[in-house]
């Protein structure tokens, strides 16, 4: 499976117990949203391998999942840090004005004055709204709330996001 055919939805945090379960961090709207997909693609650095999802549980501090072929703690621990992706073709279409985080990461962020603030490095979920983590070429990091007041236009096809945000913020 090619990188462009997959959408990263989370990552494996480590082993959970001794029977091959893994702790996961999901970047989905609903914490257990990954449990809806029968096959997960796990990988690092563009090398992906499919795993059949067998079972899942919502734990107080993490999600836990059992994947086919991962049968002991050592096998689960070996997956620590791998990304979890789902084929784009299996995901629902994003609604108008909605975006998958994976589609925003790497986009250039430009303000109304035409100044480049940097590229989207990641996003944060705060509860009230999502926040763009923008890293500039100068190493400066900016946190821009992903709300209409500040994010004026998102154009993935052009690789950019237009914001109402100053260089000095």
UniProtKB/Swiss-Prot annotation:
* Matches recorded under InterPro entries: PRC_barrel-like_sf, PRC_RimM, RimM, RimM_N, RimM_N_sf, Transl_B-barrel_sf
Gene Ontology BP term (one) = rRNA processing
Q: Domain PRC barrel spans what residues?
A: 96-169
* Assembly and binders: Binds ribosomal protein uS19.
GO CC terms, sorted: cytoplasm; ribosome
Presence of keyword Cytoplasm: yes
Identify its protein family.
Belongs to the RimM family.
Supply one GO molecular-function term.
Answer: ribosome binding
Which PANTHER family does the record associate with it?
RIBOSOME MATURATION FACTOR RIMM
Question: Cellular location of this protein?
Answer: Cytoplasm
User: What does the record give as the function of this protein?
Assistant: An accessory protein needed during the final step in the assembly of 30S ribosomal subunit, possibly for assembly of the head region. Essential for efficient processing of 16S rRNA. May be needed both before and after RbfA during the maturation of 16S rRNA. It has affinity for free ribosomal 30S subunits but not for 70S ribosomes.
Q: What is its main location?
A: cytoplasm
Return the NCBIfam families for the record: 16S_RimM
Recite the UniProt keywords alphabetically. Answer: Chaperone, Cytoplasm, Ribosome biogenesis, rRNA processing
User: This protein is called what?
Assistant: Ribosome maturation factor RimM
């Amino acid at each position: 499976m090619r990188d462009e055919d997959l959408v990263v939805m989370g990552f494996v945090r480590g082993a959970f117990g001794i029977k091959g379960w893994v702790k996961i961090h999901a970047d989905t709207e609903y914490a257990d949203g990954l449990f809806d997909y029968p096959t997960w693609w796990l990988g690092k650095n563009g090398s992906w391998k499919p795993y059949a999802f067998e079972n899942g549980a919502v734990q107080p501090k993490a999600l836990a999942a059992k994947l086919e072929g991962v049968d002991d703690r050592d096998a689960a621990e070996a997956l620590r840090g791998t990304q979890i992706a789902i084929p784009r073709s299996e995901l629902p279409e994003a609604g108008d004005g909605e975006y998958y985080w994976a589609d925003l990461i790497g986009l250039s962020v430009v303000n109304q004055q035409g100044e480049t603030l940097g590229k989207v490095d990641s996003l944060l979920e705060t509860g009230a709204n999502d926040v763009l983590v923008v890293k500039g070429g100068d190493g400066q990091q900016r946190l821009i709330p992903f709300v209409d007041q500040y994010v004026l236009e998102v154009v993935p096809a052009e690789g950019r996001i237009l914001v109402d945000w100053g260089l000095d913020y």
